[in-house]
């Protein structure tokens, strides 16, 4: 496609008006009724209910683990950022669950085919939490990139000087920006009138394609940036081990923490990017098949839209699993906060359990590894004080 044609297509997509119609006929009612009640859409709704329910449970448990005292060994900004991402997924799962149940109940109780028509503005309000969650996830990933950049550049003083304030300010900014963008997006595309099916984007699918392309490109760029940050921290970590006398214990701890956090974030964001590309592929398929569709044929976009939205609950299920599996500290915190989900006899779990009380009579035993670690930390603290002098 020539560059001029591509620019014209992009401009047309970005300024596409809502596909709502001002007046509907009996034929419109029948089209909407068929789109709502056909067996394929009913199956998609049941799949939505299944994944959204498990996604909401998974996100809730993950947030509980991050806020529980068992995860206090994790970096506070990591907990804040991960909890923010999980909260965004939780909002979307709850709203998608509600929408699926609502549509299912409406299908079973509808007496008139015209009851399947939706007011465009009510549809926009109904789908607003989902749109908010999509932007909150993207903004959250960008916020993580900013926070990790600060931690990398200021690793010598980051742990001691205001890191909690940095995390809270960034997360507050994340939600402020995503709320403004989501409200603007909904207001821009919620024209008066009626739609045949209530999708997340009440507009032509071309708009969704270009929006998803932009978000996917931004996410891939952020992922590449995370990989570069990981390599930078690993190089500094190697230099720290070679020249230990030139680095304090706080600096060494922060470098190790940076590497551990990046190894959590990269797999999690990779999963989200892969799922996003799957959704983008579905949108592109529809845009190619229905390139010149008018408002009344856009209802065929509904199945593609619902399949794409499955990305959100699937990510809500996969994201906590990947984060827990990739990080031992987070895994141990999960075992302690949610013992009913894990094997209490696991060797990892035993590391988090309190030590047994000493016996009444003296016996010769080796000291617990945790005691040795405590004494080792005390020893290094003393050495650090000597180095400072």
From Swiss-Prot:
Glycosylation sites: 23
One GO CC term on file: membrane
GO molecular function, one term: G protein-coupled receptor activity
Stretches in topological domain Extracellular: 1-45, 103-123, 189-208, 290-303
PANTHER family to which the protein is assigned, alphabetical: SERPENTINE RECEPTOR CLASS ALPHA_BETA-14, SERPENTINE RECEPTOR, CLASS AB (CLASS A-LIKE)-RELATED
Family: Belongs to the nematode receptor-like protein srab family.
Name of the protein described by the UniProt record: Serpentine receptor class alpha/beta-14
Organism: Caenorhabditis elegans
């Amino acid at each position: 496609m020539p560059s001029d044609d591509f620019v014209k297509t992009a401009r047309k997509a970005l300024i596409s008006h809502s596909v709502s119609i001002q007046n509907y006929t009996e034929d419109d009612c029948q089209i909407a009724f068929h789109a709502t009640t056909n067996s394929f859409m009913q199956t998609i709704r049941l799949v939505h209910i299944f994944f959204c329910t498990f996604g909401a449970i998974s996100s809730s448990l993950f947030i509980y683990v991050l806020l529980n005292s068992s995860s206090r060994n994790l970096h506070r900004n990591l907990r804040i950022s991960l909890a923010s991402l999980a909260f965004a997924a939780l909002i979307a799962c709850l709203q998608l669950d509600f929408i699926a149940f609502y549509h299912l109940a409406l299908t079973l109780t509808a007496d008139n085919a015209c009851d399947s028509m939706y007011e465009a503005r009510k549809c926009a309000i109904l789908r607003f939490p989902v749109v908010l969650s999509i932007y909150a996830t993207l903004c959250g990933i960008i916020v993580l990139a900013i926070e990790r950049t600060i931690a990398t550049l200021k690793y010598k003083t980051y742990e001691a000087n205001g890191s909690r304030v940095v995390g809270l300010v960034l997360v507050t900014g994340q939600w402020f920006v995503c709320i403004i963008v989501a409200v603007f997006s909904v207001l821009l595309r919620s024209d008066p009138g009626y739609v045949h099916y209530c999708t997340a984007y009440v507009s032509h699918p071309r708009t969704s394609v270009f929006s998803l392309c932009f978000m996917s490109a931004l996410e891939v760029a952020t992922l590449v940036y995370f990989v570069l940050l990981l390599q930078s921290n690993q190089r500094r970590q190697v230099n720290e081990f070679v020249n230990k006398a030139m680095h304090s214990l706080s600096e060494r701890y922060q470098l190790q923490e940076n590497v551990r956090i990046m190894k959590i974030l990269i797999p999690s964001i990779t999963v989200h990017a892969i799922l996003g590309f799957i959704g983008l592929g579905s949108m592109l398929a529809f845009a190619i098949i229905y390139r010149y569709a008018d408002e009344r044929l856009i209802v065929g976009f509904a199945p593609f839209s619902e399949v794409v939205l499955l990305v959100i609950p699937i990510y809500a299920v996969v994201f906590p699993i990947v984060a827990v599996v990739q990080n031992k500290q987070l895994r141990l915190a999960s075992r302690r906060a949610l013992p009913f989900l894990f094997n209490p006899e696991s060797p990892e779990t035993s590391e988090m359990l309190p030590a047994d009380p000493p016996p009444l009579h003296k016996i010769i035993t080796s000291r617990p590894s945790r005691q040795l670690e405590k004494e080792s930390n005390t020893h290094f603290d003393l050495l650090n004080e000597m180095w400072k002098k």
